[in-house]
């Protein structure tokens, strides 16, 4: 598995995969092990689910699905080669792993900090992109303008938090997805809305990433057909309203159980 020539990790450039693997030892054992697997001959990687909506389990994901997910995010958010990104999510789960893959595949300059509630503490650098959970976003509001685009998942963004986002320069998106779909398959803008045209603005709903189709089952729950990131049709327990063939509104859980301690809505 190759990597983009523009890829940088914590300010360092690399000539070959072995240099990246060796350097990652200094960062964390979890990242080191993932990168060893990523650059190995394996076509499929095992990833643990967070257990947000059920018992934690391990699932197998093709490397090509990781790459396809990275490309879709970059296309949707217009994140090009040389994007300066901050990784502040744990590498144990898919959201953290995908920050690494996006950087490797797309040629980003990635800084990694330990996952904590205020990842911008003692950091005055400006970034093009980062992914956070709501707790991190809440604790970073005073400095969040250092990041141009932020995706947030792993829990519900409260109306109080969204209200606070209206006065910041950063553009913030809520994510919808899961480990089985290799993080998000849809994003919803949380601020910087354009004036509504017509009855309602699509900006207030989740918008699908490229190569994703959705419909509802008999329970009114979302069904996901995303062949670029999963070979299976995903039947969820998320009750939705289909606003268009590209937009939906999340209404709640069919089983009415949400464990916000895990990462369900992955960035």
PLM-predicted stretches and their roles:
Residues 133, 154, 177, 238, ...:
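Active-site glycine-centered loops adjacent to acidic/histidine catalytic or metal-binding residues
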Residues 1-26, 67-86, 116-128:
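Conserved ATP-dependent adenylate/AMP-binding module captured primarily in the ANL superfamily
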Residues 30-48, 82:
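Conserved pre-ATP/AMP-binding loop-to-beta segment of ANL
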Residues 140, 144-195:
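Gly/Ser/Thr-rich phosphate-binding loop
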Residues 44-68, 78:
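Conserved AMP-binding A3 loop
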Residues 213-241, 247:
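AMP-binding/adenylate-forming core of the ANL superfamily
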């Amino acid at each position: 598995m190759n990597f983009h020539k523009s890829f940088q990790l914590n300010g360092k450039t690399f000539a070959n995969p072995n240099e990246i693997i060796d350097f990652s030892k200094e960062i964390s054992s979890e990242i080191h092990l993932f990168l060893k697997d990523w650059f190995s001959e394996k076509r499929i990687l095992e990833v643990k689910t967070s257990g947000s909506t059920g018992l934690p389990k391990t699932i197998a994901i093709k490397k090509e699905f990781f790459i396809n997910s990275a490309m879709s995010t970059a296309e949707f958010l217009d994140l090009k080669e040389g994007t300066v990104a901050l990784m502040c999510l744990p590498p144990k789960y898919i959201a953290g792993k995908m920050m690494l893959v996006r950087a490797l595949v797309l040629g980003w300059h990635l800084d990694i900090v330990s996952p904590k509630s205020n990842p911008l503490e003692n950091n005055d650098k400006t970034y093009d992109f980062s992914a956070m959970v709501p707790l991190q976003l809440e604790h970073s509001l005073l400095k969040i303008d250092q990041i141009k685009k932020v995706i947030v998942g792993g829990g519900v963004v409260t109306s109080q938090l969204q209200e606070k986002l209206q006065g910041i320069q950063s553009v913030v998106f809520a994510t919808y997805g899961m480990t089985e779909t290799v993080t998000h398959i849809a994003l919803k803008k949380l601020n910087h809305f354009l004036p509504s045209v017509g009855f309602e603005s699509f900006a207030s709903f989740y918008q699908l990433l490229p190569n994703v189709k959705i419909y509802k089952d008999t329970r009114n729950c979302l069904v996901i057909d995303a062949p670029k990131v999963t070979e299976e049709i995903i039947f969820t327990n998320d009750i939705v309203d289909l606003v268009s063939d590209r937009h939906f509104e999340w209404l709640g859980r069919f089983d009415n159980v949400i464990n916000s301690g895990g990462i369900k809505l992955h960035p």
